[in-house]
């Protein structure tokens, strides 16, 4: 997409987000599930695009986010990444893909990153997922922290 509203075309990275926070700058974030919307959101200068498990509701018409699969999230993640030049792209790991073991969490995280080329992942949960998140980070995968948020299990 030609031109960015903000005029800033530099790729947003996790390091850059930390710098923005330290300077007290506002950080913008919107959700996208597809190539075309991702181009529009990215072109508007949004800093972070979340490929949320809410695609289950918005794109597939499900009542909850629980039915969405890892492969469906990968599809949406790939579509969004292809449409983005500037924004940092975060992909949700869907419920049930990281809760049973740290090994499963890392395996699924690596799969999503290798196939989608996203910039970071997001897992929902609290203290019960800390060890899985630590292993994912140790594998070199950035995590967009949302500890304490458990929307998927409280629907």
Please describe what each predicted stretch is.
Residues 1-6, 88-99:
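Glycine-rich phosphate-binding "P-loop"
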Residues 86, 97-100, 104, 110-155:
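Conserved anion-binding
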Residues 10, 15-22, 42, 78-82, ...:
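Surface-exposed amphipathic alpha-helices with a cationic face
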């Amino acid at each position: 997409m030609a031109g960015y509203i903000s005029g800033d075309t530099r790729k947003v990275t996790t390091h850059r987000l930390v710098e923005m926070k330290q300077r007290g700058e506002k950080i913008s974030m919107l959700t996208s599930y597809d190539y075309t919307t991702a181009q529009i959101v990215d072109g508007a200068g949004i800093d972070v695009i979340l490929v949320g498990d809410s695609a289950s509701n918005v794109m597939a018409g499900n009542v909850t986010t629980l039915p969405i699969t890892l492969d469906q999230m990968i599809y949406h993640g790939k579509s969004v990444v292809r449409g983005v030049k500037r924004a940092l792209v975060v992909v949700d790991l869907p419920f049930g893909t990281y809760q049973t073991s740290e090994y499963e969490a890392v395996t699924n995280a690596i799969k999503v990153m290798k196939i989608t080329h996203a910039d970071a992942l997001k897992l929902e949960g609290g203290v019960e997922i800390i060890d899985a998140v630590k292993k994912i980070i140790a594998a070199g995968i950035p995590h967009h922290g949302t500890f304490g948020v458990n929307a998927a299990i409280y629907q």
